[in-house]
Amino acid sequence: MAGSLNKVTLIGNLGRDPEIRTTGEGKEIANLSLATTDIWKDRVTGEKKEKTEWHRVVIFNEGLVSVVKNYVKKGSKLYIEGSLQTRKWNDSSGVEKYTTEIVLQNFNSQLILLDSKNSTSSSLQDSGHSEYKHSKPSFDHSDLDDEIPF
């Protein structure tokens, strides 16, 4: 059994277009602002209530950044898996600042586009290499009926 686990899974909508930045080494990084909303009915008033939580998502994986650049925009519904990381820095006044982010990099990160252009679910998983998947079959299954002997 593993000693610990750091895994975050979210389904939500982007609150703004992705921000793509380039590091000094020329590597692209995508920053996303993902909203998740809890909806419930108030027991006393019967009124519908909701609470939206905003999550910072940072993508370092080259393949995932490419998908974000080409297919993701404000309002996109995404499924993401990553790890939770907190970074610390000093602002211009020397005050320590902290931020907690969901980070997608290297292995065990996943990004699924839940509302692609063709109304089919598309996904990109990073398991050592980038691979873009479509849920449509790669061949037509209707041709198989002609070969069944009964």
From Swiss-Prot:
Keywords: DNA damage, DNA recombination, DNA repair, DNA replication, DNA-binding
Biased composition (Basic and acidic residues): 128-142
GO biological process terms, semicolon-separated: DNA recombination; DNA repair; DNA replication
An example Gene Ontology CC term for this record: nucleoid
Every SSB domain range: 5-111
One term of GO molecular function: single-stranded DNA binding
DNA-binding region of this protein: 54-60
SUPFAM superfamilies: Nucleic acid-binding proteins
Superkingdom of this protein's organism: Bacteria
Residue span of motif Important for interaction with partner proteins: 145-150
Coiled-coil parts of chain: none
InterPro entries assigned: NA-bd_OB-fold, Primosome_PriB/ssb, ssDNA-bd
Pfam families linked to this entry: SSB
Disordered as annotated region, ranges: 119-150
Subunit description: Homotetramer.
Function of the protein: Plays an important role in DNA replication, recombination and repair. Binds to ssDNA and to an array of partner proteins to recruit them to their sites of action during DNA metabolism.
Name the record gives this protein: Single-stranded DNA-binding protein
Species for this entry: Rickettsia bellii (strain RML369-C)
